[in-house]
């Protein structure tokens, strides 16, 4: 293969500054593993404290829904640049009995919003939609959890109230939007230091206002957030600063049941969620790739096929939204027809594909959590605020900052609609049994990362750590393929080979530029889970100590 050998990118042993104030010794600075193997439950998340929150629930006898809810609330505290309780989520659940369901906690456009007359802002209150994270997590816990909500939310409340130490990557992200954060009282109070400027790596970020809000949610199951005094405060703040969300919008919001979409890839069952998520895109890309023989192709040839398959499938996102559209997009016949448009090596210069040009509307600022418990429940959960820090507007006194949904961000989205994106919580099953639990952060690159990890495992026989470390490709336009060259990336010979196929090629050495995945694999022969958190990120994978949920 024309990239660094299968030992791959080394999994980091992070020593981040994770000490939580007020003597929480269990979170003292320590080496952080990005992979784990266990016969018990397991969790992987993009921040060590979120993974610890999830494992804490498993160790207390909770199930995967408890762990995912805890990790999701926790990550909303410790990765505010990526997500928030004022944001959106998509949740895919495989139950212990083998059934699958989905929860749509996507932000929704307010009823009085008119895209023709609304400001085309790229941040601020005018971009704020109706938040869905709290409703999504409340539904996940109420319908599938087993521990008391106060127990499940305790880690997030602790992190907000006592504080956590900023990681190096967070410092860079917060600094990028410092001026925008300083524009509103709430965001300035939450994320700007008293002496000015954003928080640095190692600084203790305390969010006491957010802690109070989380306590209210834990006490009343989110009722105050959508229909009580918290809702009244949020609506007054948003409307008073040029936004559109009203108390009625908040009161009427519901986390909806997602349409589950299915497909197959080389004998494995694929399961995802339809729009607003991009499960059908991920399935179609894999089913296009299934039309080609991996064993007969070089690594550069397979990279070119993979990039095109993802590009073609991604063009489907705008046309999805009905049962018939989902069935067409995930059908083998449609994959066959789309595969005929893929250019194989030696076919001459690249021309336009079915994909068209698309903006990367989610940016790279999203987070993902994967959880499995020993009883067979699996959760794959994506949570986001859209671009970095979302709207960059927060309600003072509540500590809640909001996702960007409206205005210049998603432009022509209509009242009542939910913001569709490339988020793709995903499952791979073999003979009805768990095989992979996967998802990623990274905007339009999310399906690309998921598809390539799955292909590396199934087609190349890699374990998850190898598949995660292997270099990725992405096709941002009809004739351009980007290739990851940060070590251990694609070698120059591979880059030149793809260029020789007739594509323009851009070598991208920046780590983390090809999405950031979280993956679990069940090894049936060993009866154990293998978990890996993205090696280009600062996350963590942890196995539970307790063997079974209550």
Task: Map each language-model feature to its residues.
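Noncatalytic scaffold domains of N-terminal-nucleophile
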Residues: 30-52, 56, 62-221, 225-227, ...
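Active-site rim segments in enzyme catalytic domains, especially the processed small/beta chain
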Residues: 77-84, 92-94, 99-101, 244-246, ...
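Bacterial N-terminal signal peptides that target proteins for export
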Residues: 1-15
């Amino acid at each position: 293969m024309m990239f660094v050998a299968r030992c791959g990118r080394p999994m980091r042993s992070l020593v981040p500054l994770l000490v939580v104030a007020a003597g929480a010794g269990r979170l003292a600075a320590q080496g952080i593993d990005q992979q784990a193997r266990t016969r018990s439950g397991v969790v992987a998340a993009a921040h060590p404290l979120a993974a610890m929150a999830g494992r804490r629930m498993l160790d207390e006898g909770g199930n995967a829904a408890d762990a995912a809810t805890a990790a999701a609330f926790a990550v909303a505290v410790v990765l505010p640049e990526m997500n928030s309780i004022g944001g959106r989520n998509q949740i895919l659940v495989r139950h212990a009995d083998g059934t699958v369901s989905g929860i749509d906690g996507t932000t929704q456009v307010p009823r009085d919003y008119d895209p023709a007359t609304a400001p085309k802002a790229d941040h601020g209150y005018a971009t704020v939609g109706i938040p869905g994270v709290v409703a999504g997590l409340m539904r996940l816990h109420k319908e599938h959890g087993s521990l008391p909500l106060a127990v499940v939310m305790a880690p997030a409340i602790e992190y907000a109230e006592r504080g956590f130490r900023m990681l190096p990557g967070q410092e860079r992200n917060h600094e990028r939007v410092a001026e925008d954060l300083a524009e509103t009282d709430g965001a300035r109070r939450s994320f700007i230091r008293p002496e000015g400027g954003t928080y640095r790596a190692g600084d203790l970020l305390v969010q006491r206002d957010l802690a109070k809000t989380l306590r209210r949610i834990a006490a009343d199951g989110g009722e105050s957030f959508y229909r009580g005094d918290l809702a009244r405060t949020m609506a007054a703040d948003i409307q008073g600063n040029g936004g559109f969300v009203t108390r009625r919008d908040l009161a009427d919001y519901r986390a909806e049941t997602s349409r589950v979409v299915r497909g197959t890839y080389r004998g494995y069952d694929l399961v995802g969620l339809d729009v607003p998520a991009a499960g059908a895109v991920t399935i179609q890309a894999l089913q296009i790739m299934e039309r080609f023989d991996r064993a007969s192709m070089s690594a550069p040839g397979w990279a070119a096929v993979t990039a095109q398959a993802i590009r073609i499938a991604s063009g489907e996102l705008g046309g999805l939204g009905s049962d018939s559209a989902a069935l067409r997009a995930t059908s083998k016949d449609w994959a066959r027809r789309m595969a005929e448009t893929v250019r194989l090596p030696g076919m001459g210069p690249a021309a336009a594909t079915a994909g068209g040009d698309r903006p990367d509307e989610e940016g790279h600022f999203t987070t993902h959590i994967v959880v499995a418990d020993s009883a067979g429940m699996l959760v794959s959960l994506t949570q986001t605020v859209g671009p970095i820090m979302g709207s960059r507007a927060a309600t003072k006194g509540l500590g809640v900052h909001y996702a960007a949904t409206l205005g210049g961000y998603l432009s022509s989205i209509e009242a009542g609609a939910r913001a569709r994106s490339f988020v793709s919580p995903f499952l791979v099953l073999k003979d009805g049994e768990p095989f992979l639990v996967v998802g990623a952060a990274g905007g339009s690159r999310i399906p690309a990362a998921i598809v390539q990890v799955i292909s590396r495992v199934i087609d190349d026989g890699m374990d998850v750590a190898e598949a995660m470390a292997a270099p990725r490709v992405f096709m941002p336009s009809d004739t351009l393929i980007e290739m990851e060259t940060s070590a251990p990336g694609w070698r120059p010979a591979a880059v030149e080979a793809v260029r020789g196929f007739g594509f323009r090629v851009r070598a991208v050495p920046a780590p983390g530029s090809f999405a950031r995945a979280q993956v679990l694999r069940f090894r049936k022969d060993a009866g154990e889970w293998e978990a890996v958190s993205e090696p280009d990120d600062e996350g963590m994978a942890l196995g539970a100590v307790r063997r079974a949920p209550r």
